[in-house]
Amino acid sequence: MNALEITQKLISYPTITPKECGIFEYIKSLFPAFKTLECGENGVKNLFLYRIFNSPKEHAEKEHAKEKHAKENVKPLHFCFAGHIDVVPPGDNWQSDPFKPIIKEGFLYGRGAQDMKGGVGAFLSASLNFNPKTPFLLSILLTSDEEGPGIFGTRLMLEKLKEKNLLPHMAIVAEPTCEKVLGDSIKIGRRGSINGKLILKGVQGHVAYPKKCQNPIDALASVLPLISGVHLDDGDEYFDPSKLVITNLHAGLGANNVTPGSVEITFNARHSLKTTKESLKEYLEKVLKDLPHTLELESSSSPFITTSHSKLTSVLKENILKTCRTTPLLNTKGGTSDARFFSAHGIEVVEFGAINDRIHAIDERVSLKELELLEKVFLGVLEDLSEK
């Protein structure tokens, strides 16, 4: 089966987070020669398929070369394709049923076509057509919870794989990374995310008696330019400057003649490797040192980067250039993704997939040409990694 046929089938399953809807049974049926691991909690399901091609022992026997470098305990390169089969709710006003894929004017329409059943369909097809001549371990990791909290999805499966000594060396997450043409962007990392809540304390009172009040909004005004929109570092070649963004501000009882007793500010900082939760706390405490306050910070994801000169990045770039005739931009833009869980285990990981102009939108679609090219890129990566 090719990428188009597989993607059509995947879209037909209404897998709104965290529903799996039986899609894993279909995927398993495509890979009868692969071993299977499954896990999940709280309604989330995860699937891991893997196969060792030409085990070192078998390969040595075939080549009549039983030297010490071809012993059975020599581990082959383990490469993993990763993704999610869950989708966000489709919403209304689609031109067609979002879970009944249709082809129109060179595009495949359906929820998840770009994010990310198109990418999954492409790497499943590439995996089916892969036939290496040397020892190679190929795996596929899929979850039904990436669009949701992600607590029991890829992160949980990787923990299980660590217990079984099955963590991959390299992985491509098939997120829709491209902006205008297929191949124009590879994510080699992601920014981290820190959420915070700041409460400035005052003394509530009657507006007619200002000497008896301490209005925390006045205090906030004096430090707001040092908090809202401030750059926490200067970034680097791949990361934009880390920035603190206020997301909510609340004070008062709603009465026109009562000053508030406190003002609450919630904020988020998307940050590079140069900024940490500790450095952000140090900065804010310095700014707020003369003001009564409480401060809470929580890191929801850590920043990471895979070097632009890594083997995986180089092989992917070469295949994109060869197949798509495009030189990809290496960047770390966008929100968080499951790639961060791979990086946390020391796995070399990048993200590459379809154009993202209609992700989470009505009439989501992917071009038939994209699916064809994606499949070729992914297969080329497999073939090159197995030969190098």
Curated annotation (Swiss-Prot):
Pfam families in the record: M20_dimer, Peptidase_M20
Pathway in which the depicted protein is active: Amino-acid biosynthesis; L-lysine biosynthesis via DAP pathway; LL-2,6-diaminopimelate from (S)-tetrahydrodipicolinate (succinylase route): step 3/3
Necessary cofactors: Zn(2+); Co(2+)
Protein name: Succinyl-diaminopimelate desuccinylase
Active site: 86, 146
Protein family membership: Belongs to the peptidase M20A family. DapE subfamily.
InterPro entries named among the record's database cross-references: ArgE/DapE_CS, Bact_exopeptidase_dim_dom, DapE_proteobac, Peptidase_M20, Peptidase_M20_dimer, Peptidase_M20A
Quaternary structure and partners: Homodimer.
GO molecular function: acetylornithine deacetylase activity; metal ion binding; succinyl-diaminopimelate desuccinylase activity
Catalytic reaction annotation: N-succinyl-(2S,6S)-2,6-diaminopimelate + H2O = (2S,6S)-2,6-diaminopimelate + succinate
Entry EC number(s): 3.5.1.18
Binding locations of Zn(2+) 2: 115, 147, 360
CDD domains per the UniProt record, alphabetical: M20_DapE_proteobac (cd03891)
An example Gene Ontology biological process: L-arginine biosynthetic process
Function: Catalyzes the hydrolysis of N-succinyl-L,L-diaminopimelic acid (SDAP), forming succinate and LL-2,6-diaminopimelate (DAP), an intermediate involved in the bacterial biosynthesis of lysine and meso-diaminopimelic acid, an essential component of bacterial cell walls.
Annotated residues for binding of Zn(2+) 1: 84, 115, 175
Bound cofactor: record note: Binds 2 Zn(2+) or Co(2+) ions per subunit.
Keywords per UniProt: Amino-acid biosynthesis, Cobalt, Diaminopimelate biosynthesis, Hydrolase, Lysine biosynthesis, Metal-binding, Zinc
HAMAP family: DapE
